[in-house]
A protein has these predicted regions:
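Conserved short alpha-helical segments that host acidic/polar catalytic motifs at enzyme active sites
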Residues: 1-318
Length: 318
């Protein structure tokens, strides 16, 4: 599980020192969803800059200048494409007609290999599934609601994207993965979950905010002046049934994302990358483990397998 995070300081509330401190605290809280790599994108007078390294957020040294009003960030838990090769880490650079942009993704795409063939996308050394989103936008040669909508409707799987262009427009493209956006007096903060964002806000010492509603199928655009625009796309995931009744656990709707901040469907999907059967994840739910406990187990897959084996042994003996 990865985490998206960021700041839109449209009223120039913060100094460079304050921005760097804020992003440090926010990104460190995001380590709950990924410690393999950390990256940020921001604009200066010289254009779009991306800074990323295969390290946990608390080890990153941020140098965000005073002139940078928007910071888009990502902490990574590796699934596809080694974090040791920095080009696999987020955010990814992109370019359309006279416009640079950066894209970050939380989730797992299932049809990236198919899209590379059917859309005749250029060959690349980047191994992550996420990068096809950049290539699909580049194929349209423009960055706007229409090109983003086309990209979102072609990619299948779990996702939430953030896209920052060189003009300081930030797009949030919400599929079935979580996103929390809070508006303060003169700036916005966002992160993948309310829990992460509220913990960071408390540590930073901020108060008095309102929550921006964003649902699955929404494309939210925040302009450099803080204005919000919203359009929609059709979210579709032909892998919906992967964690549903096919495994025999019909009582739980794994994609009831609006009522769950930590999503069992996504956790089960990530667990499969570590050789853990998604059905076993659902079994843990049946035995009373909550989403956060299961997510924490993924940081020690061997211990998770041990727990699963003990439950199965107990079932056999009963």
């Amino acid at each position: 599980m990865c985490c998206l995070f960021g700041l839109i300081d449209y009223n120039n509330i913060f100094t460079a020192k304050e921005k760097n401190r804020l992003i440090k605290i926010l990104s460190t809280e995001c380590e709950a969803r990924g410690t393999d790599a950390t990256g940020i994108a921001f604009n200066t007078e010289n254009g779009l800059h991306i800074s990323k390294r295969p390290v946990a957020a608390h080890k990153m040294c941020y140098r965000i200048p005073d002139s940078s009003k928007v910071v888009m960030g990502h902490t990574r838990m590796t699934t596809q494409g080694s974090e040791k090769f920095n080009f696999n880490n987020h955010p990814f650079p992109g370019h359309v007609d006279k416009l640079d942009f950066a894209l970050a993704h939380n989730g797992v795409l299932h049809n990236d290999s198919e899209l590379r063939i059917t859309e005749r996308l250029p060959k690349t050394n980047i191994q992550t599934d996420s990068y096809v989103a950049v290539q699909l936008i580049e194929k349209e040669n423009t960055l706007n609601f229409d090109s983003i909508k086309k990209m979102a409707e072609k990619t299948e799987g779990s996702f939430c994207y953030t896209i920052l262009d060189v003009k300081n427009n930030l797009f949030i493209v919400k599929g079935n993965n979580p996103m929390a956006v809070y508006k303060f007096n003169g700036f916005y903060l966002y992160a993948s979950t309310d829990e992460i964002l509220t913990r960071a806000i408390k540590k930073i010492g901020l108060k008095n905010y309102s929550k921006i509603n964003i649902s699955c199928g929404d494309i939210l655009k925040i302009s450099p002046n803080g204005m919000i625009e919203m359009q929609t796309f059709e979210f579709k995931d032909r892998y919906y049934g992967m964690f549903g009744s096919g495994y025999g656990y019909t009582a739980y709707d794994p994609y009831d994302y609006e009522s769950n901040d930590i999503y069992i469907g996504e956790i089960a999907e990530y667990a499969s990358y570590f050789g853990i059967d998604p059905e076993d994840v659902m079994m843990l739910i049946e035995y009373g483990y909550d989403e956060l406990e299961i997510e924490e187990m993924l940081y020690d897959p061997l211990e998770m397998q041990k727990c699963i084996s003990e439950i199965k042994l107990c079932e056999m003996m009963c």
